[in-house]
Curated annotation (Swiss-Prot):
One GO cellular component term noted in the UniProt record for this chain: cytosol
Protein name according to UniProt: SsrA-binding protein
Sorted UniProt keywords: Cytoplasm, RNA-binding
Superkingdom, natural source: Bacteria
Gene: smpB
Subcellular location: Cytoplasm
Species annotation: Salmonella typhimurium (strain LT2 / SGSC1412 / ATCC 700720)
Amino acid sequence: MTKKKAHKPGSATIALNKRARHEYFIEEEFEAGLALQGWEVKSLRAGKANIGDSYVILKDGEAWLFGANFTPMAVASTHVVCDPTRTRKLLLNQRELDSLYGRINREGYTVVALSLYWKNAWCKVKIGVAKGKKQHDKRSDLKEREWQLDKARIMKNAGR
């Protein structure tokens, strides 16, 4: 009998969209599957993905991921034309799609990709319903983060 591979903690994450949390208030998160081609899976296994500028469009009752860039590997396939920025279908159930439609129709809301990761053998994308931040919101978040770091540093030094 074969042994299971040892799971490396933290190795399931393929790509993060850190800018999304900086530029948007994330109100609700959903987990969606991705309809991928073979060369895309190979690229994801190699960690060659970028979702920094990606967002989700809902049309004709389906969700589509725009702007995600999966860099094709040179040895992936010679007979298939690889389009790194093609739109990819998101696999969501109808209840989740209806919830997204209801939230997006409100003024100022959008859906952005937050992270791309492996769940068992399946590639999943975490998407979030987001509302854009104003400049002063970004500044206050930065101040809060700096204060938390300073506070932790003070507490660490106070114990000495």
